[in-house]
From Swiss-Prot:
Domain S1-like, residue spans: 1-72
Organism: Solibacter usitatus (strain Ellin6076)
Family annotation (PROSITE patterns): S1_IF1_TYPE (PS50832)
Family per record: Belongs to the IF-1 family.
GO cellular component, one term: cytosol
Protein name: Translation initiation factor IF-1
Keyword RNA-binding applies: yes
NCBIfam families: infA
Function: One of the essential components for the initiation of protein synthesis. Stabilizes the binding of IF-2 and IF-3 on the 30S subunit to which N-formylmethionyl-tRNA(fMet) subsequently binds. Helps modulate mRNA selection, yielding the 30S pre-initiation complex (PIC). Upon addition of the 50S ribosomal subunit IF-1, IF-2 and IF-3 are released leaving the mature 70S translation initiation complex.
UniProt keyword Hydrolase, yes or no: no
Gene3D superfamilies given in the database record: Nucleic acid-binding proteins
Amino acid sequence: MSKEDSIEVTGTVLEKFPSGLFSVQLEHERVVLAHLAGRLRRNRIRVLAGDKVTLELSPYDLTKGRITFRHR
């Protein structure tokens, strides 16, 4: 799947799970599970509850995503 196939949305982190997953509420009130992208993990970007983030969702499964950017 190429980058053009993914859906990019923004949301707010609700909670962090011990396994590295995050519960994120999207702008349109949907809650999805997301994990950090490798670039964020490699640069040790901290994501906490309440942070605004940008997600990539697969068009095949809209319940799981990847956090690609943390807004300030």
